[in-house]
Amino acid sequence: MSNAAIRMEQLMLPTYPEPGKEEMPLFSEHRVHQRSTGRPYPNKVTLEVNRERKIERSYTVVHLENEYLDVLVLPEIGGRIFAARDKVTDYDFFYRQHVIKPGLIGALGSWISGGVEFNWPYHHRPSGFLPCDFETEECGDGSVIC
């Protein structure tokens, strides 16, 4: 394979769905999150976790691949790099989760471990568990962009 490939796929993962979000984010303003204060408005905040009910859920995955790397990006969960594998050594070089089980670590509540997430303006950013917009492009030189 001389060129990189990019494709959209569906990935089934065991998932613990988020419970309902706080309908009045004003009441979450005093929830301190790792030294950053509240004020989530206009975003709703998840204040609980679900540990009882697990479902199988399909996620849209952007799959990028060349002869050396195999990378999965989850745009539905903040655009995080969900998995990245070195094809030469068959080694996952980031921790790869095999279940989506949110904890209350994110700025708006839900957050998952594993992979790599873009963190701005601070760690476990507010949109880390929200869907993100994305585009894919196949370039003339054989590279791909997501």
Which residues does each predicted region cover?
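Active-site beta-strand termini and strand-to-loop segments that position acidic
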Residues: 64-67, 86
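Extended, loop-rich substrate-binding clefts of extracytoplasmic carbohydrate-active enzymes
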Residues: 26-56, 61-65, 113-146
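A short, sequence-level motif marking secondary-structure junctions
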Residues: 12-15, 74-81, 98-102
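A broad, low-specificity signal marking well-ordered, structured residues that form hydrophobic/aromatic
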Residues: 6, 62, 71, 82, ...
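Active-site-surrounding "flap" and adjacent substrate/cofactor-binding loops of secreted or lumenal enzymes
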Residues: 88-108
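Primarily extracytoplasmic ectodomains and periplasmic/lumenal surface modules that are beta-strand-rich
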Residues: 69-72, 78-82, 89-92
